[in-house]
Amino acid sequence: MENTQDFSPPHMDASRPSLGFPLGTALLLIIIFSLSGIFSCCYHWDKHRSLRRSLANGRPSADIESNPYKPKPPFPEMKKPQNLSVPVLMPGDNTPKFIALPCPCAPPRPEKLTVDVQTPPQSPPVKPARFPVPLY
């Protein structure tokens, strides 16, 4: 009656990777962040290029986010002031019924406004009629 137990480690398959969960997760996060950094650099390539040019010239750029290739308006001094009011179409059944335009100034208001509230005279409360109720 011999009890022999096998305390040897279980057989490991050679094709199974030996990376643990924390190391695999760390590698996955490093790959994700590096790919997002590469895509971000490609997306903002014109800003990086203008920053490198300004640093090569020796003068730091005042506004990094401005686009150097954006065309300027041809005649900036001939800009007309924008009208801040817009007409509004009021809805109707099938077609607009009314066009609301902004008022150039506030309408004149009376200085003193009096409101007279009239209450009807109080009548005594009416008592309900009494009816005999049979108790069965």
UniProtKB/Swiss-Prot annotation:
This chain's source organism reads: Arabidopsis thaliana (Mouse-ear cress)
What residue intervals traverse the membrane?
19-39
Q: Classify the main location.
A: membrane
This protein's UniProt keywords? Membrane, Transmembrane, Transmembrane helix
Topology in the membrane? Single-pass membrane protein
Region annotation (Disordered) ranges? 54-87, 112-136
Q: Where in the cell is it found?
A: Membrane
- What does the entry list under GO cellular component? membrane
Entry keyword annotation includes RNA-binding: no
Q: Mitochondrion: present as a keyword of the record? A: no
Where on the tree of life does the source sit, at the highest rank?
Eukaryota
- Its name, as the record gives it, is Uncharacterized protein At5g65660
